[in-house]
UniProtKB/Swiss-Prot annotation:
UniProt cross-references to PANTHER family, sorted A to Z: 40S RIBOSOMAL PROTEIN S15A
Pfam families in the record: Ribosomal_S8
Superkingdom to which the source organism belongs: Bacteria
InterPro entries in UniProt: Ribosomal_uS8, Ribosomal_uS8_CS, Ribosomal_uS8_sf
rRNA-binding found in the keyword field: yes
GO biological process: translation
GO cellular component, one term: ribosome
Designated name of the protein: Small ribosomal subunit protein uS8
Organism: Rippkaea orientalis (strain PCC 8801 / RF-1) (Cyanothece sp. (strain PCC 8801))
Keywords: Ribonucleoprotein, Ribosomal protein, RNA-binding, rRNA-binding
Amino acid sequence: MAPNDTISDMLTRIRNACAVRHPTTQVPTTKMTRSIAQVLKEEGFIEGFEETGEGVQKYLVLTLKYKDKNRQPIINMLKRVSKPGLRVYSNCKDLPRVLGGIGIAIVSTSKGIMTDREARRQNVGGEILCYIW
């Protein structure tokens, strides 16, 4: 059965894989999950991702990133903000700073999916999808 909220599903799969220190995790491919994975890669939260599968069953295989030999995950917390039942929007002036700029907020804007810093730089607001730190 396909999940209704693909973003929450993606964040949960990443959170669970980090908790048990798996090197990779699979998430179903959508335009949104691909864009979020690209932002995570650009910000250094994951090492990379690749698309696998064919036809209807396509997946993104995310390669997770860990610190030092103790394999502490780079991603400490993933928090979904805007949900299907309660959307959260913000203009560019009111975009939140996550942990004083240490973390990021992923924002869906009219110019695509980007971080809160990039949205402020481009002077656009949008839907706050999630916080990551």
